[in-house]
Amino acid sequence: MAALLITATDTEVGKTVLTTSLTAYWQTYRGKKGLGLMKLLQTGVGDQERYHQLFGADSSIEIKVPLWFKTPVAPPVAAAAEGKTIDLKRVWQEFCALQQRQSFVLLEALGGLGSPVTEELTVADIAGQWRLETVLVVPVKLGAIAQAVANVALARQHQIKLKGIILNCSQPISEEQLKDWTPINLIQSLTSTPVLGILPYISDLNDLEKLTQAASTLDLEKLLPL
């Protein structure tokens, strides 16, 4: 499957930073090949708007957000509040069609791996059932080790094809804090999952050059078809 699902341990911990960094890298170095950029499902304002702000003018990048709810809460709660249903069949069909049209698809999940998509299914269920190659974003902070262990265990429970972990610095941190909060060897030992890189703190998330540079520090051979 020519796609990568980007999920995380929680909401607001770096999925969109990784997604836009990989997209910026693709735009810079693989621009002749089409890329699909898709949000699994969106509630409230956010990712769809950022995608269009950063990449909307590039015809080689096709942006898709099949389902959107105005209420910025968990999808089943938002759907109930708005009197709507969550049509995952539509999402799957648009995802498959996007793969047919483009060389590769970056699919950004919502919330964390355990976040509900419907009243019955979580992101982990979707990743497992759709057999998506997946990367897990873990924030660099106190408690990150436990979050990584718990989420990798959840991924294994759902037989997810987890390619690795990306550590994300959402704020400026010291080398000492990085080593203390997210010791790579310990995380890899406890999870039996490779850490594919560390996204540095990016002061301007609208700077495509900085996003590209951030992506270039990662183990891209495991993330993109280079």
Curated annotation (Swiss-Prot):
The active site is at residue 39. It is an enzyme of class 6 (ligase). InterPro entries: DTB_synth_BioD, P-loop_NTPase. It holds the Pfam family AAA_26. ATP binds at residues 12-17, 47, 108-111, 168-169, 200-202. SUPFAM superfamilies: P-loop containing nucleoside triphosphate hydrolases. This is ATP-dependent dethiobiotin synthetase BioD. Mg(2+) binds at residues 16, 47, 108. It comes from the Bacteria. Its cofactor is Mg(2+). PANTHER family: ATP-DEPENDENT DETHIOBIOTIN SYNTHETASE BIOD 2, DETHIOBIOTIN SYNTHETASE. One of its GO terms (molecular function) is ATP binding. Its EC number is 6.3.3.3. It is found in: Cytoplasm. Transmembrane segments: none annotated. Belongs to the dethiobiotin synthetase family. The keyword Transmembrane does not apply. It catalyses: (7R,8S)-7,8-diammoniononanoate + CO2 + ATP = (4R,5S)-dethiobiotin + ADP + phosphate + 3 H(+); (7R,8S)-8-amino-7-(carboxyamino)nonanoate + ATP = (4R,5S)-dethiobiotin + ADP + phosphate + H(+). Keywords: ATP-binding, Biotin biosynthesis, Cytoplasm, Ligase, Magnesium, Metal-binding, Nucleotide-binding. GO terms for cellular component: cytosol. Gene3D superfamilies: P-loop containing nucleotide triphosphate hydrolases. The keyword DNA-binding does not apply. Homodimer. Pathway: Cofactor biosynthesis; biotin biosynthesis; biotin from 7,8-diaminononanoate: step 1/2.
